[in-house]
From Swiss-Prot:
The keyword Membrane applies. It comes from Tetradesmus obliquus (Green alga). Belongs to the ATPase alpha/beta chains family. GO terms for molecular function: ATP binding; ATP hydrolysis activity; proton-transporting ATP synthase activity, rotational mechanism. Its main location: plastid. It catalyses: ATP + H2O + 4 H(+)(in) = ADP + phosphate + 5 H(+)(out). This is ATP synthase subunit beta, chloroplastic. One of its GO terms (biological process) is proton motive force-driven mitochondrial ATP synthesis. Pfam families: ATP-synt_ab, ATP-synt_ab_N, ATP-synt_VA_C. F-type ATPases have 2 components, CF(1) - the catalytic core - and CF(0) - the membrane proton channel. CF(1) has five subunits: alpha(3), beta(3), gamma(1), delta(1), epsilon(1). CF(0) has four main subunits: a(1), b(1), b'(1) and c(9-12). Produces ATP from ADP in the presence of a proton gradient across the membrane. The catalytic sites are hosted primarily by the beta subunits. It is a peripheral membrane protein. Keywords: ATP synthesis, ATP-binding, CF(1), Chloroplast, Hydrogen ion transport, Ion transport, Membrane, Nucleotide-binding, Plastid, Thylakoid, Translocase, Transport. Its EC number is 7.1.2.2. The gene is atpB.
Length: 480
């Protein structure tokens, strides 16, 4: 706003927790989604700055807005400035290596962002004519993912797993691999999760080289956090802030972007809180009536265009393990693949602990992947499934009671299970073994050799934590 006379100023008329009613002059009502700012002193004389977003027009020149900051200390009668536009956040290379809040303000104590460009967080999804409709697989360099539950370029993947099974390390490896193999960048949205987890992720990213402290612009990721101690408005909008940064890398820099949301359930949960505060009638299980619309508006912006792609990996919390709960059920409708992490595999020391039988992908079709890849994946799954069925018999009677054919299946399945493990680049500092990126062709070649029985004479330990099959052969030779 250039001069004071053109400013549109209203006054707070009612405060209900994080929801504010604001009265404006006749004919000066701000638009829905406009950002409003309140700069004032509270009763203790301390400076306050609160940003809120218009959600409803109440009539009589009154609007109802949801605050993005805590509203403690606000009073009726305080002046509210209409910025005349939606929330704008910084975008571009200068966001890499930094941590932002929902308003696009850096919160990592590294000073302001030197930035030329900013974009509004509310944007329309790309038009259909701009979309890239080709079905192509997004190679991650992680054997178990690429072979058995491949990601779609520009697709959406659900990441399921409890605490301590390796979600964070898998996320960091994906960030590292997209930067090295695809020249892409990543944006991480921490939506309504613990502050401690956000801090741990940031620290681990610095240790593993995903964030380069000496020269932040060489970092591979931008972080946007709206933690669970923040108002529901911030948690509801933080995913859009991060998505806006990701869209810039896709549309302007024409890059492949990995977009992480941890956790998509908290996005829905925040929307439910805001919906109730705005006085909307709740729908099933107390969720907002606009649940599918809100989820659709976010998910439709995550897509591939002819310029670049946003491939999204979303951690999904399932309340009370009920997959029919409206929040996870609505999320599933948008997912192209699921990566399920297994505590059983993690306890065996097989990392990444991706469950090869529970993880799924819509890309696992012969007409998309080709017969060679599809046939190999199906044979691996068949072998592992048979091993799973035989485990009870082995536990009771032992291996010797199995038929010759079944013993061969078990031996190959154990080799496959170990060959699905892989040393990660980001874990080098902890494990001491160098990370490996395995191309899809090498992955298929390796598993086909195991399935064909070419490597039946090798010890199964030779397949544990190696990259391609040649490394397994080298390891076996060194073990003799």
């Amino acid at each position: 706003m250039s001069d004071l006379n053109t400013k549109n100023v209203g006054k707070i008329s009612q405060i209900i927790g994080p929801v504010l009613d604001i009265a404006f002059g006749q004919g000066q009502v701000p638009n829905i989604y406009n950002a409003l700012t309140i700069k004032a002193k509270n009763a203790a004389g301390l400076e306050m700055s609160v940003t809120c977003e218009v959600q409803q027009l109440l009539g009589d020149s009154c609007v109802r807005a949801v605050a993005m900051n805590p509203t403690d200390g606000l009073m009726r009668g305080m002046e509210v400035l209409d910025t005349g536009k939606p929330l704008n956040v910084p975008v571009g290379k200068s966001t890499l290596g930094r941590i932002f809040n929902v308003l696009g303000e850096p919160v990592d104590n590294l000073g302001p962002v030197k930035n030329e460009e900013s974009l509004p967080i509310h944007r329309t999804a790309p038009a259909f004519v701009d979309l890239d409709t080709r079905l192509s697989i997004f190679e991650t360099g992680i054997k178990v993912v690429d072979l058995l539950a491949p990601y779609r370029r520009g697709g959406k993947i659900g990441l399921f797993g409890g605490a301590g099974v390796g979600k964070t390390v898998l996320i960091m490896e994906l960030i590292n691999n997209i930067a090295k193999a695809h020249g892409g960048v990543s944006v991480f949205a921490g939506v309504g999760e613990r502050t401690r987890e956000g801090n741990d992720l940031y620290t681990e990213m610095k240790e593993s080289g995903v964030i380069v402290e000496k020269n932040l612009i060489d970092s591979k990721v931008a972080l946007v956090y709206g933690q669970m101690n923040e108002p529901p408005g911030a948690r509801m909008r933080v995913a859009l802030t991060a998505l806006t940064m990701a869209e810039y890398f896709r549309d302007v820099n024409k890059q492949d972007v990995l977009f992480f949301i941890d956790n998509i359930f908290r996005f829905v949960q925040a929307g439910a809180e805001v919906s109730a505060l705005l006085g909307r009638m709740p729908s099933a299980v107390g969720y907002q009536p606009t649940l599918a619309t809100e989820m659709g508006a976010l998910q439709e912006r995550i897509t591939s265009t002819k310029d670049g792609s946003i491939t999204s990996i979303q951690a999904v919390y399932v309340p009370a393990d009920d997959l029919t709960d409206p929040a996870p059920a609505t999320t599933f409708a948008h997912l192209d693949a699921t990566t399920v992490l297994s505590r059983g595999l993690a306890s065996k020391g097989i990392y990444p602990a991706v469950d090869p039988l529970d993880s799924t992908s819509t890309m696992l079709q012969p007409w998309i992947l080709g017969e060679k890849h599809y046939g190999c994946a199906q044979s691996v799954k068949r072998t592992l499934q048979r091993y799973k069925e035989l485990q009870d018999i082995i536990a009771i009677l032992g291996l010797d009671e199995l038929s010759e054919e079944d013993r061969l299946v078990v031996a190959r399945a154990r080799k496959i299970e170990r060959f699905l493990s892989q040393p990660f680049f980001v874990a080098e500092v902890f494990t001491g073994s160098p990370g490996k990126y395995v191309s899809l062709a090498e992955t298929i070649e390796g598993f086909n050799k195991i399935l064909a029985g070419e490597l039946d004479d090798l010890p199964e330990q030779a397949f544990y934590l190696v990259g391609n099959i040649n490394e397994a052969l080298t390891k076996a030779a060194s073990m003799k």
